[in-house]
């Protein structure tokens, strides 16, 4: 079911070569949706919602009312609500540690240089929906935005066919401090938030979605900022002979239940463990739902890679640059410094990926598809902008003038040079 690959090899090289996220046909469809909404506004959003979600949305029910959110509280399990609040508090505490103050540094001659670090004014967050419930995605996007100080956080989530929003999604939104909630999903939601169709336009859009949402975010980038381009979920597990096969198998399956495009990778120097994990995967799938999805994802996208030693395992992990990286070895912290490319690293047998996905505090909006090489997890800085401050004194200006003139003339920008020259006292 799961391919077995020896590293290094051509098979390993081929497997570790990441696939592109782009889909030409979907890109064209998304572009049409964006252009239609840009030109026609919110009425086009309503039409697409009817076509794609089967829900009737209009001016009267587009924005979720406070009364509907109040009612949602009566529909949720009190134990789940308590767990959501504890998770929210963990997420808030973790992200508060990321806050940095603005700074301005005066110098002896009166010059001042600095940086203002301030929150964005208005952020839109996308939460997958319909009949499904993803309250954890609400918390992971909205709580850091509020920690950053964003005054207006807008949420878009697709309605069910009856127009309803899952009550857990609504409750999580209020608990996280979301200010406005709209019934819309897909590329049309991204377009509405970016172009201001039926609501005030946002400055940035965050949150996961399907390929239509992801490519819509890609196409509106520049009109608004985005967090990242998220692809299918993935996990890579580095394990040695001390790892319990049942743990590795369970963590594999926790990822591939997401989607037939999800991927799970085991990298191990132990062929005995590799065989044991294969057996455990089969055993655990017998009592889990979504078997067809898991089998397809394991067959199409997943692998067991056998390496010489743990140093080689780290090399493979860094090439793959996974969204989630688990280390189930005798000395997991010994590998931490060698693992340089990952969205999140989970160390030890009691740090399975769901601990981070739901509860511990670090963000679960993570780079996928190898983009952990240059993207970071969603964080407080995601919702901040930085402005440079320059206040030169007369003495510093006169001291630097000749250097600035030389550089401006070198680049052939005479008006730049003139802006300095007119200030030099003769």
Swiss-Prot record:
HAMAP family: HisD
Textual note on the cofactor: Binds 1 zinc ion per subunit.
EC number annotated for this UniProt entry: 1.1.1.23
Gene this chain is encoded by: hisD
GO BP terms, alphabetized: L-histidine biosynthetic process
Native species: Heliobacterium mobile (Heliobacillus mobilis)
Family classification: Belongs to the histidinol dehydrogenase family.
Binding site for Zn(2+): 255, 258, 357, 416
Gene3D superfamilies, A to Z: 1.20.5.1300, Nitrogenase molybdenum iron protein domain
Protein name: Histidinol dehydrogenase
Cited InterPro entries: Ald_DH/histidinol_DH, Histidinol_DH_CS, Histidinol_DH_monofunct, Hstdl_DH
Active site (record annotation): 323-324
SUPFAM superfamilies: ALDH-like
Listed GO CC annotations: cytosol
Keyword Zinc: yes
Known role: Catalyzes the sequential NAD-dependent oxidations of L-histidinol to L-histidinaldehyde and then to L-histidine.
Reaction(s) this enzyme catalyzes, per UniProt: L-histidinol + 2 NAD(+) + H2O = L-histidine + 2 NADH + 3 H(+)
Sites where the protein binds substrate: 233, 255, 258, 324, 357, 411, 416
């Amino acid at each position: 079911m799961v391919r077995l690959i020896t590293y290094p090899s051509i098979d390993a090289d081929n497997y570790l070569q990441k696939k592109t996220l782009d889909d030409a046909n979907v890109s064209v469809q998304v572009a049409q949706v964006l252009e239609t909404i840009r030109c026609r506004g919110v009425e086009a959003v309503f039409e697409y919602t009817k076509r794609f979600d089967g829900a009737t949305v209009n001016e009267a029910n587009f924005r979720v009312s406070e009364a509907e959110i109040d009612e949602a509280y009566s529909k949720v399990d009190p134990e789940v609500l308590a767990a959501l609040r504890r998770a929210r508090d963990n997420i808030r505490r973790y992200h508060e540690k990321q806050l940095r103050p603005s700074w301005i540094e005066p110098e002896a001659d009166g010059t001042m240089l600095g940086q203002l670090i301030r929150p964005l004014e208005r952020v839109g967050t996308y939460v997958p929906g319909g009949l499904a419930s993803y309250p954890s995605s609400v918390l992971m996007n909205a709580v850091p935005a509020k920690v950053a100080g964003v005054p207006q956080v807008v949420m878009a989530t697709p309605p069910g066919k009856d127009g309803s929003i899952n009550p857990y999604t609504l409750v999580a939104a209020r608990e996280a401090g979301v200010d406005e909630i709209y019934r819309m999903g897909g590329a049309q939601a991204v377009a509405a938030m970016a172009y201001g169709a039926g609501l005030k336009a946002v400055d940035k859009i965050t949150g996961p979605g399907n390929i239509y949402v992801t490519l819509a975010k890609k196409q509106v980038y520049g009109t608004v900022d985005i967090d990242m381009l998220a692809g299918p979920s993935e996990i890579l597990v580095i394990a040695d002979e001390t790892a319990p096969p049942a743990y590795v198998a369970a963590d594999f399956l926790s990822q591939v239940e997401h989607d037939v495009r999800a991927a799970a990778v085991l990298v191990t120097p132990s062929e005995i463990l590799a065989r044991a994990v294969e057996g455990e995967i089969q055993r655990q799938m017998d009592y889990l739902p979504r078997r067809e999805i898991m089998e397809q994802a394991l067959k199409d996208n997943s692998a067991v890679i056998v390496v010489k030693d743990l140093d080689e395992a780290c090399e493979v992990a860094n090439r793959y640059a996974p969204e989630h990286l688990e280390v189930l070895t005798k000395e997991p912290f010994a590998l931490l410094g060698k693992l340089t490319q990952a969205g999140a690293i989970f160390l030890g047998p009691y740090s399975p990926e769901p601990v981070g996905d739901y509860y511990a505090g670090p963000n679960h909006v993570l780079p996928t598809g190898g983009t952990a090489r240059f993207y970071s997890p969603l964080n407080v800085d995601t919702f901040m902008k930085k402005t440079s401050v320059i206040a030169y004194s007369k003495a510093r200006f006169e001291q630097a003038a000749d250097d600035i003139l030389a550089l401006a003339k070198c680049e052939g920008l005479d008006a730049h040079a003139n802006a300095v020259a007119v200030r030099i006292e003769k």
